[in-house]
């Protein structure tokens, strides 16, 4: 081209004279130019293809982790070129958080991407569903410069010899596991302030890249000096986890009885998962002395000290000497039911013999208190002592102090089955017993027909720690009067020769009340047992005893046995009674007794709300029935006794019945928290009622 330009005028004249030569020159020129352009394009294609191949190799190497799992492999991404690494800066890196954040650099590179199709800048970071800036610790810039692309094969070995804290799989639980289980040689300093964050990567590489990363090692030494004592304490406790795993506001304080050298948080929680494993934490047991002073009313019901719980609760509730019950009522037997010797006295007690022989009926209170749940005594304590008869004698059937802890069902201790009306571990609401005081003989056969309706035998002995009780010591009784100490299940009449099987769950004797229709019978003779039968309307078909016992376990279980020529007083109210109750009947088949079932069904609406016992006197009574008891009952709220009933000795059932509760009574009885504030006030209140 330059030569033709230099010989321009001469060639022009020659071409004019020789046009063929000129055209040949033009053709040669074009051919040469075409060859040059072809060679140039060839060179450019070679260059472009090599560039593309190199970039493809790089992308394939760095993208291999993305194709394998959803999370990038931190090892391989962290060792690429600087241009691949710059978007990986964590925003925690305070010096570079604005300049080198991934989003900012992506915005700067977008125009350059569109300019040339050959310059494909790496878009592989976008393919990860998570932003890698939050998945990997911030790489130190000096460490990145130490690993150029050319040195990668030499340093592959070091990558795979990194400590276990960097060898993570693609899951969040692996991140937690690797952070929670650092190797002993890894000096991972935990969450440090952002100014010393670059040294975290140095902690992982400590001991393996000593020659290459001296500055990082100095940072580590400074870090160890920077850790003040409170830092060390914080690192040893629950804060030694990455910032993403920190649980705010949970402070685990060691208890005083825990040894000081036991770490509160174990160093290794290696079961995996995104949440820390709390199974190795040794939480101290609850304090033996409760912090709240009111909690002493309800002591721990879980040991062998259930009898002390009972006495403690009773003393708190003011059940002490001054109940106004008359001179012969033995209050200490009620106050500490196991320790007092009056409970150990047997049927040969002179008071009991006197009650057998005297024509005047006496109330023989056989108090065999189980270890009552504290909640049952805490609300209404001892409702049955409101009869106020002056000849109440508390020497009970001798109660042995063996707490039945293994096989005792909810109502383990009381040998009186009337006090086990609901026997399902899920239900704990005690059915109300509107106790019949059957004056005169009743039809035991009709009650015997209704008695085989079963208890629901679904009681489990696991509730024995809730209500541990005092079984009846039947060794001193005659064999025809013994009761199984753990009676429940189908309630049939007591077979008098039944041996005292301690863990019998088959035979439920009905309310063996020692009812003797004639006053002079010896105690060895077989008595007529007062029986309890359900009213038959409970919705459970053949299991009318299967009643909800939701709120309270069995309360104060007492039995007042009244023995007189023709009357028998059967009193066994649970302290908390909700639901239908039981009507007792006694004696042989005579006397119209059909009315008290209807009377009970009329009273059921009261008994569902009230928690006091409904006492119904049924049957014809002899004039020898105690007028003192009638007068005392007339003073108790909820009973109406007519004057003719008092004159006749409470002759008919209609004379003494429970009036429907008013709205005030319902609210007062249905509120389980309506405790009187002072035990002395409650004591005086009960004494006033009984006078």
UniProtKB/Swiss-Prot annotation:
Residue list for modification N-acetylalanine: 2
Protein name per its UniProtKB record: CREB-regulated transcription coactivator 2
Function: Transcriptional coactivator for CREB1 which activates transcription through both consensus and variant cAMP response element (CRE) sites. Acts as a coactivator, in the SIK/TORC signaling pathway, being active when dephosphorylated and acts independently of CREB1 'Ser-133' phosphorylation. Enhances the interaction of CREB1 with TAF4. Regulates gluconeogenesis as a component of the LKB1/AMPK/TORC2 signaling pathway. Regulates the expression of specific genes such as the steroidogenic gene, StAR. Potent coactivator of PPARGC1A and inducer of mitochondrial biogenesis in muscle cells.
Subunit structure: Binds, as a tetramer, through its N-terminal region, with the bZIP domain of CREB1. 'Arg-314' in the bZIP domain of CREB1 is essential for this interaction. Interaction, via its C-terminal, with TAF4, enhances recruitment of TAF4 to CREB1. Interacts with SIK2. Interacts with 14-3-3 proteins, YWHAB and YWHAG. Interacts (probably when phosphorylated at Ser-171) with YWHAE. Interacts with calmodulin-dependent catalytic subunit PPP3CA/calcineurin A. Interaction with COP1 mediates nuclear export and degradation of CRTC2.
Cross-link (Glycyl lysine isopeptide (Lys-Gly) (interchain with G-Cter in SUMO2)): 234
Similarity comment: Belongs to the TORC family.
UniProt-annotated stretches for the region Disordered: 1-30, 174-195, 280-306, 335-491, 513-543
InterPro entries: TORC (IPR024786), TORC_C (IPR024785), TORC_M (IPR024784), TORC_N (IPR024783)
PANTHER family xrefs: CREB-REGULATED TRANSCRIPTION COACTIVATOR (PTHR13589), CREB-REGULATED TRANSCRIPTION COACTIVATOR 2 (PTHR13589:SF6)
Compositionally skewed regions (Low complexity) per UniProt: 335-383, 390-411
PTM remark: Phosphorylation/dephosphorylation states of Ser-171 are required for regulating transduction of CREB activity. CRTCs/TORCs are inactive when phosphorylated, and active when dephosphorylated at this site. This primary site of phosphorylation, is regulated by cAMP and calcium levels and is dependent on the phosphorylation of SIKs (SIK1 and SIK2) by LKB1. Following adenylyl cyclase activation, dephosphorylated at Ser-171 by PPP3CA/calcineurin A resulting in CRTC2 dissociation from 14-3-3 proteins and PPP3CA.
Polar residues: compositionally biased ranges: 1-20, 174-186, 447-468
Sites of Phosphoserine modification: 70, 86, 90, 136, 171, 274, 306, 368, 393, 433, 456, 489, 492, 611, 621-622
Keyword Transport on entry: no
Entry-annotated residues carrying Phosphotyrosine: 488
Gene Ontology molecular-function annotations: cAMP response element binding protein binding; chromatin binding; transcription coactivator activity
One Gene Ontology term from the biological process aspect of the record: cellular response to cAMP
Cellular compartments per GO CC: cytoplasm; nucleus
One Pfam family linked to the record: TORC_N
Motif stretch (Nuclear export signal): 271-287
Organism: Rattus norvegicus
Primary localisation category: cytoplasm
Residue numbers carrying Phosphothreonine: 169, 192, 501
Residues modified as Asymmetric dimethylarginine: 51, 99, 120, 123, 161, 168
């Amino acid at each position: 081209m330059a030569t033709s330009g230099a010989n321009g005028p001469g060639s022009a004249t020659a071409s004019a004279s020789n046009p063929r030569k000129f055209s040949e020159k033009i053709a040669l020129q074009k051919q040469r130019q075409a060859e040059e352009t072809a060679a140039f394009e060839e060179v450019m294609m070679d260059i472009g293809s090599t560039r593309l191949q190199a970039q493809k190799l790089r992308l394939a190497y760095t993208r291999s982790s993305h194709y394998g799992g959803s999370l990038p492999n931190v090892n391989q991404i962290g060792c690429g070129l600087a241009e691949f690494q710059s978007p990986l800066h964590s925003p925690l890196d305070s010096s570079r958080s604005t300049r080198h954040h991934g989003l900012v650099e992506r915005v700067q590179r977008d125009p350059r991407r569109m300019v040339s199709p050959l310059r494909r800048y790496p878009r592989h970071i976008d393919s990860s569903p998570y932003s890698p800036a939050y998945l990997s610790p911030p790489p130190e810039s000096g460490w990145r410069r130490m690993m150029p692309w050319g040195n990668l094969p030499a340093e592959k070995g070091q990558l795979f010899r990194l400590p276990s804290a960097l060898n993570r799989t693609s899951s969040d639980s692996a991140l937690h596991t690797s952070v929670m289980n650092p190797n002993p040689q890894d000096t991972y300093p935990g969450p440090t302030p952002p100014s010393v964050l670059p040294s975290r990567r140095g902690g992982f590489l400590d001991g393996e890249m000593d020659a290459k990363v001296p500055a990082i090692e100095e940072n580590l030494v400074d870090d160890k000096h920077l850790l003040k004592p409170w830092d060390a304490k914080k690192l040893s406790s629950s804060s030694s986890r990455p910032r993403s795993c920190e649980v705010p506001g949970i402070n685990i304080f060691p208890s005083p009885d825990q040894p000081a050298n036991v770490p509160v948080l174990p160093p290794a929680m290696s079961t995996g998962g995104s949440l820390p494993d709390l199974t190795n934490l040794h939480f101290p047991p609850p304090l033996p002395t409760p912090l709240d002073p009111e909690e002493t009313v309800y002591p721990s019901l879980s040991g062998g000290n259930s009898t002390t719980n009972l006495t403690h609760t009773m003393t708190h509730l003011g059940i002490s000497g001054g109940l106004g019950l008359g001179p012969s009522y033995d209050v200490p037997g009620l106050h500490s039911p196991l320790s007092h010797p009056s409970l150990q006295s047997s049927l040969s007690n002179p008071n009991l013999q006197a009650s057998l022989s005297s024509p005047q009926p006496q109330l023989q209170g056989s108090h065999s208190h189980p270890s009552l749940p504290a909640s049952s005594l805490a609300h209404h304590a001892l409702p049955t002592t409101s009869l106020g008869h002056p000849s109440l004698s508390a020497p009970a059937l001798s109660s042995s102090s063996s707490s039945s802890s293994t096989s005792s069902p909810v109502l383990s201790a009381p040998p009186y089955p009337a006090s086990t009306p609901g026997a399902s571990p899920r239900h704990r609401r005690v059915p109300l017993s509107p106790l019949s005081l059957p004056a005169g003989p009743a039809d035991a056969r009709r009650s015997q027909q209704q008695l085989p309706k079963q208890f629901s035998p679904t009681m489990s002995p696991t509730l024995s720690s809730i209500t541990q009780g005092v079984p009846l010591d039947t060794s001193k009784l005659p064999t025809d009067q013994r009761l199984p100490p753990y009676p429940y299940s189908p309630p049939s009449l007591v077979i008098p020769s039944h041996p005292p099987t301690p863990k019998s769950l088959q035979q439920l004797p009905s309310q063996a009340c020692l009812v003797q229709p004639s006053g002079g019978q010896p105690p060895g003779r077989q008595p007529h047992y007062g029986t309890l039968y359900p009213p038959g309307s409970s919705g459970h078909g053949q299991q009318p005893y299967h009643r909800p016992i939701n709120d309270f376990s069995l309360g104060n279980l007492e039995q007042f046995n009244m023995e007189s020529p023709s009357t028998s007083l059967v009193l066994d109210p649970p302290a908390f009674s909700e639901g239908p109750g039981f009507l007792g009947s006694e004696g042989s088949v005579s006397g119209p007794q059909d009315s008290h079932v209807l009377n009970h069904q009329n009273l059921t609406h009261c008994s569902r709300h009230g928690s006091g016992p409904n006492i119904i006197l049924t049957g014809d009574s002899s004039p020898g029935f105690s007028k003192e008891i009638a007068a005392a009952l007339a003073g108790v709220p909820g009973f109406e006794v007519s004057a003719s009933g008092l004159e006749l000795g409470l002759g008919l059932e209609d004379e003494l019945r429970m009036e429907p509760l008013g709205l005030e009574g319902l609210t007062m009885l249905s509120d389980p928290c309506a405790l009187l504030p002072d035990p002395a006030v409650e004591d005086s209140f009960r004494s006033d009622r009984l006078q």
